[in-house]
Amino acid sequence: MKEPSERLIDMLGHPYNQRNVQALLQSFGVKHMPPPNSYFNDDIIWSVKTSIRIDIYRAPKINDLTGRKYTNQDGWIIGAIHFLAPGSDDRIKAPFPGKLPNGITMSATPDESIKAYGQPELYEECWWPGFSGRILAWRKPGINIAIEYADSEVDRVMRSYTACLIGCIGAWRDDNPDIFAP
């Protein structure tokens, strides 16, 4: 049987249904998932209890961003799933408690992630105000995966695992279009 994280990632490109997502996360104690609440073409749905962020888009916007046709209806489509750990956002107090795809967890090292997913298409050391670390990213059929590691005093710590339909890092489309543009 698939892990909840894998089943959630399988929802990418499908309409956001708060009841289905809640049922999937029920084993983590989630009793309610909020509906979309945005006047714009995108919204963020948080499940702080499970350290998950879901990016959703109106169908015309995700169709335009990806160059694909996910649906003709003007509903909300899941475009990205973020499994988070402390340091990724002020709301997040504990790492995502479940297993991630390919058997890794939020405690996986960069080498363990590379072993699980193969050589990344993007392997970047980053230093910007308030952050230093490493970003690993893979392009798989129909999905992009990005794992961000923050430098700590002793090691590198995973602070986010993102699976998305479009560039999981906004700049990918401009910086590495040969790899990550739709």
Report residues per predicted region:
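A cross-family detector of function-defining hotspots
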Residues: 3-4, 14-89, 99-182
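Active-site-proximal segments of catalytic enzyme domains
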Residues: 95
